Amino acid sequence: MKKSLLALVALGAFAGAAHAQSSVTLYGIIDEGFIFNNNANGKHLYGLSSGVMQGSRFGLRGTEDLGGGLKAIFTLENGFDVNSGKLGQGGLMFGRQAYVGLSSPYGTVTLGRQYDSVVDFVGPLEAGDQWGGYIAAHPGDLDNFNNAYRVNNAIKYTSPSYAGFSFGGLYSLGGIAGQFARNQVWSLGAGYNNGPLVLGVGYLNARTPSNFGGMFNNGSSDPTTSGKLPVTTPVYGAYANSANTYQVIGAGGAYTFGAATIGATYSNTKFKGFSVGPFVNQTATFNNGEINFKYQLTPALILGAAYDYTQGSKINGSSAAKYHQGSLGVDYFLSKRTDVYVIGVYQHASGNTLDANGNVVQAHASINGLDPSSTSNQVAARVGIRHKF
């Protein structure tokens, strides 16, 4: 009897140890609230909107200890609309992220649908990623700092941190037989995070970026399953839909002193290789600069403010499109997992841009993620609640 009890205890201890070597975590965010747009194609818009501060999601994250410091990892992350229950990211089951890989003391290699290096290293320094949500992102999220687009079929390496310094890279296979370079996406980035100072730099290059009707929908044997997200923003949609190459160079930094953090970002976005329209054999360039400020007024209350300026290219002598944008935010934490927030954004546009047909038109204000204004000005306000689990 004693031997049987000892055997059961030993077996239970062994099973517990084996179980501890692997784990699967269910996590998620539910972000919901009221949003106001003072000019949605010429009309006021009041309504509920899901996922403004952060996209509503749930996911599974797992790891298995393989021994010797090597681990198998995976992430499957779904995006959804709280108001309708519909899938986000073009209807994909795991449209936000879906990858599997190996992690070791020498770095992590993952394969699947993932974020590019600009998102990883520069995106977190933008106001939209910190406290402003997607409506505080740069116009149309033209530099993808706010991860409007993911990369399919991607192989990615991320280094460990060396005294605060880390780096990484991503390459996405084009998936077109006989045309190795077509539809490919590649990206490189590096960052430094040590004490009060955070720095980031990144590069992104995508061939035929809007192939199959949406940014980065590359290399699928059945393109209808790749989560089409048509580029409809009037800020750069006409360029993205006809360019052969989309290129982003981004950099940013932030410094914390006491309860305050001041930061800045810069991006240079180019659309190259046009075959039709006013930019044939030319390059359309957008430069964006942002300064942002965050203040931890109390352990539960964060205040934020940001200003960013975007300038596009001149179109055959016409004045370049220019976008001035200011954002304010207040975020109050009811607990570690639940907060309520208020965000306000104002944008003013001037100059000229292209419409969907390639015609030169006056630039209109277009706050990211919202219906564009019918004039040069637009105001948006958001009151929301976010719960993490």
What are these regions, as identified by a protein language model?
Residues 22-36, 46-177, 182-205, 345-349:
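Outer membrane beta-barrel
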Residues 43-46, 86, 142, 174-175, ...:
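Extracellular loop and loop/strand-boundary signature of outer-membrane beta-barrel proteins
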Residues 50-53, 90-92, 147-149, 180-182, ...:
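Short sequence motifs at beta-strands and strand-loop junctions characteristic
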Residues 191-327, 331-332, 346:
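Detector for outer-membrane/organellar transmembrane beta-barrel domains
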